[in-house]
Amino acid sequence: MATNTMLCLLILSVVLALAFATNKKGDEEPENHSTGIFGKVGRVVTVALAMSSRLGGADATRGGGAVYGGNLKSNLLPNNNWMAPPPPMAMRSAKVYDSKHSPAEYLKKFAQDFRRKTGMHSQRHHEETTLEQEKRVAGAGPDPIHHQDTTLEQEKRAVPAGPDPKHHEETTLEQEKRAVPAGPDPKHHEETTLEQEKRAVPAGPDPKHHEETTFEQEKRGAPAGPDPIHH
């Protein structure tokens, strides 16, 4: 590089000297003054460039490319592997499934992954429904076939009049009064008292049931007095 710059400076100095020498001669010949200066300067510049290019080419051939070798060395980075290609990437295997697992196991695993990602479940998962789920599905309540143990309260809600007497045969006197307005059935309650007979028969109790009558009762029954046969 130093030799090239020195040669260029030398050539420029020669060109300038020639230019000034031609200017002095041009003053002596005024008819060529308009075109002499610029034309001569242009010719000198082209000659200088041609000489510098020839000198540079000769030095390059003589030094075996030493001119450009220095530039290349100066452009090198600290990393010596800057032009090295990247390492080859690991190629994936073209097998659909691993050799350790059979195709059936691979398909089963694939189905499980698919159901987990999509949120789908098998039919066996949906068959296990609880009573709470049945209530939500059917607004009236669960199916009586599945739940046969019904209580008295549930039967009252199902039948407004009350539970079925076949299921609940032990009825009390109060329940019979509500069912029959006239009162309970005398067949169920045979032990009737005198007060109950008075309510049933306005004239009084039956003398067959109460044969032991007193003298006061006979007076009320017969105004003339008691029967002398009995007394």
UniProtKB/Swiss-Prot annotation:
Chain intervals with Basic and acidic residues compositional bias: 125-137, 144-221
Gene: CLE-4B-1
Tissue specificity field: Highly expressed exclusively within the dorsal esophageal gland cell during syncytium formation in host plants.
Compartment annotation: Secreted; Host cytoplasm; Host extracellular space; Secreted, Extracellular space, Apoplast
Family: Belongs to the CLV3/ESR signal peptide family.
Carbohydrate-modified residues: N32
Function: Mimics host plant CLE extracellular signal peptides that regulate cell fate. May play a role in the differentiation or division of feeding cells (syncytia) induced in plant roots during infection.
Required for secretion from the host cytoplasm to the host apoplasm, as annotated region: 21-83
Any one Gene Ontology molecular-function term assigned to this protein's record: receptor serine/threonine kinase binding
Mapped CLE- repeat ranges: 136-147, 157-168, 178-189, 199-210, 220-231
Protein name as catalogued: CLAVATA3/ESR (CLE)-related protein 4B-1
Entry superkingdom: Eukaryota
GO cellular component, one term: host extracellular space
InterPro entries, A to Z: CLV3/ESR (IPR044962)
Keyword Plastid: no
Signal sequence bounds: 1-21
Listed PANTHER family: PROTEIN CLAVATA 3
Organism expressing this protein natively: Globodera rostochiensis
